């Protein structure tokens, strides 16, 4: 198993290290355009092997040739958000970057699974799908796992319970229009609505929607990376080990939820072939309406990129 991580910034490097530590691949390639950065970080990771007790080979490179025959490609390249920026503000700049990256990686790896992390997430996943010409099952985005993790962490903090006992789904676009689905949120099987007042739930939902911006505002010059990297690696683990995990991911919907030809966060079954099934769960009317509105925002932004992707 060979996994390539594109982008040796905070998210990419953290993800590469977690992949190596968990021995999800025999070889991890960390790619970046800045000479020395991926090589130095990869060597540092490899040298942690005797302490972390892993044998994964980790290489850094600025040459796409070294990514050849990758089974999974994690794309984290792009500009990070700054205070006051929305994910959509990054649209044109990161679309150009993701287009170039995708064009290059598929030259050397013929049938990889591509996991997108670059923002704005759902739109960049669309860019990766169009440019790679891979089957839709093999191009997906990391969004809902992260958004759900944030929602779960806020619930655990509020109730002072273990995060392990929290189950939650956040669907829709990876942005302010995301849709935390409260009806499927539970604590050790107990519906959240039985443990928490509605106004408190609404506060946590709002905080989840603004979770990325909250961290950006603290950091001033950068964005979240521990939780995004961990979320991406959870998806990789599900694929590498064919776990058939049900996780919320950005997937190409073709009629599900009344949404057509748009990448948006939905519950999927993840296995060795990528997305093996998109689950169409029952949503309340307001949730379904919010999901469709979220998809409409993604679709509009994708349409604005038509000339770039031609």
Curated annotation (Swiss-Prot):
Keyword NAD: yes
Family matches, as InterPro entries: L-lactate/malate_DH, Lactate/malate_DH_C, Lactate/malate_DH_N, Lactate_DH/Glyco_Ohase_4_C, Malate_DH_type3, NAD(P)-bd_dom_sf
Gene3D superfamilies referenced in this protein's UniProt entry, alphabetically: Lactate dehydrogenase/glycoside hydrolase, family 4, C-terminal, NAD(P)-binding Rossmann-like Domain
One biological process term in Gene Ontology: tricarboxylic acid cycle
Record-linked Pfam families: Ldh_1_C, Ldh_1_N
Active site: 174 (proton acceptor)
EC number of the protein: 1.1.1.37
Reactions accelerated catalytically: (S)-malate + NAD(+) = oxaloacetate + NADH + H(+)
Binding site for substrate: 81, 87, 119, 150
Alphabetical keyword list: NAD, Oxidoreductase, Tricarboxylic acid cycle
GO MF annotation list: L-lactate dehydrogenase activity; L-malate dehydrogenase (NAD+) activity
Positions of NAD(+) binding: 7-12, 32, 94, 117-119
General function of this protein: Catalyzes the reversible oxidation of malate to oxaloacetate.
Family: Belongs to the LDH/MDH superfamily. MDH type 3 family.
HAMAP family, alphabetized: Malate_dehydrog_3
Descriptive protein name: Malate dehydrogenase
């Amino acid at each position: 198993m060979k996994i390539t991580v594109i982008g040796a910034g905070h998210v990419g490097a953290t993800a590469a290290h977690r992949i190596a530590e968990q021995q999800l691949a025999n070889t991890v390639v960390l790619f970046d355009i800045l000479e020395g950065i991926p090589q130095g970080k990869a060597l540092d990771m490899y040298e942690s092997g005797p302490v972390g007790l892993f044998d994964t080979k980790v290489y850094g490179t600025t040459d796409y040739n070294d990514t050849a025959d990758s089974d999974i490609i994690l794309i984290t390249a792009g500009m990070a958000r700054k205070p006051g920026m929305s994910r959509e503000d990054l649209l044109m700049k990161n679309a150009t970057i993701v287009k170039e990256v995708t064009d290059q990686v598929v030259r050397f790896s013929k049938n990889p699974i591509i996991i997108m992390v670059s923002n704005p997430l759902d739109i960049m996943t669309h860019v990766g799908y169009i440019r790679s010409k891979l089957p839709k099952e093999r191009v997906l985005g990391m969004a809902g796992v992260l958004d759900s993790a944030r929602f779960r962490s806020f619930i655990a903090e509020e109730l002072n319970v273990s995060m392990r006992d929290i189950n939650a789904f956040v669907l829709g676009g990876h942005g302010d229009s995301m849709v935390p689905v409260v009806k499927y949120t539970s604590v050790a099987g107990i519906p959240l609505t039985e443990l928490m007042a509605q106004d408190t739930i609404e506060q946590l939902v709002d905080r989840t929607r603004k979770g990325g911006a909250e961290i950006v505002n603290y950091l001033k010059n950068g964005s979240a990376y521990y939780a995004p990297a961990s979320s991406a690696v959870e998806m990789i683990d599900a694929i590498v080990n064919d776990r058939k995990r049900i996780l919320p991911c950005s997937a190409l919907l073709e009629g599900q939820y009344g949404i057509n030809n748009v990448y948006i966060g939905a519950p999927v079954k993840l296995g060795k072939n990528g997305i093996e099934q998109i689950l169409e769960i029952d949503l309340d009317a307001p949730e379904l309406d919010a999901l469709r509105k979220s998809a409409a925002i993604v679709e509009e932004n994708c349409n604005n990129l038509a000339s770039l992707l031609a």
